[in-house]
């Protein structure tokens, strides 16, 4: 019974983090434009989930965060969920492949995820019939990369809390 209780708290914490991130995204970050682009806090949550839990956890968090964000965006429903899921899998797989090297690799992965998000969103959006100008991708990608790189280390601590310190050794190595 204790295991179910722990899972329930983990689920509630995860939902709380996603809802708070969404509220901050649409209320605070939406007004902090840099070169016409805004940071993506939900993307940072997905990146941190992939780093702390691997590809499976990154995919699950990516899908959930993407669907939640799709509810408030004026884009084809599922577009953000698809891109976040792909990024969660990629970051989780890269984090597993890199292993416990420590250092700045979470920041590098987060920056790469920001660039990938801008590219994937544009490519998949154009495939489903939403015309996104490809010329805007580098600028948007750089803004997303910068925001993601800055916010990923604090978000790793949040994800550690969500999962009840389930992987403290890995996180302690990451955050040294």
What are these regions (language model features)?
Residues 1-176:
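Terminal, non-globular segments
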């Amino acid at each position: 019974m204790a295991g179910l209780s722990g899972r329930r708290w983990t689920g509630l914490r995860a939902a709380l983090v996603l809802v708070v991130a969404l509220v901050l995204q649409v209320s605070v970050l939406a007004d902090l434009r840099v070169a016409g682009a805004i940071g993506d806090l939900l993307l940072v949550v997905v990146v941190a989930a992939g780093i702390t839990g691997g590809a499976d956890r990154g995919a699950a968090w990516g899908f959930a965060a993407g669907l939640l964000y799709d509810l408030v965006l004026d884009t084809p429903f599922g577009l953000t969920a698809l891109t976040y899921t792909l990024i969660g899998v990629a970051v989780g797989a890269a984090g597993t492949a890199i292993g416990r090297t420590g250092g700045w690799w979470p920041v590098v992965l987060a920056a790469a995820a920001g660039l990938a998000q801008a590219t994937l969103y544009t490519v998949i959006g154009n495939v489903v019939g939403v015309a996104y100008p490809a010329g805007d991708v580098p600028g948007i990608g750089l803004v997303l990369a910068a925001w993601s790189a800055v916010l990923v280390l604090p978000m790793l601590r949040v994800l550690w809390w969500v999962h009840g310190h389930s992987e403290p050794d890995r996180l302690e190595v990451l955050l040294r």
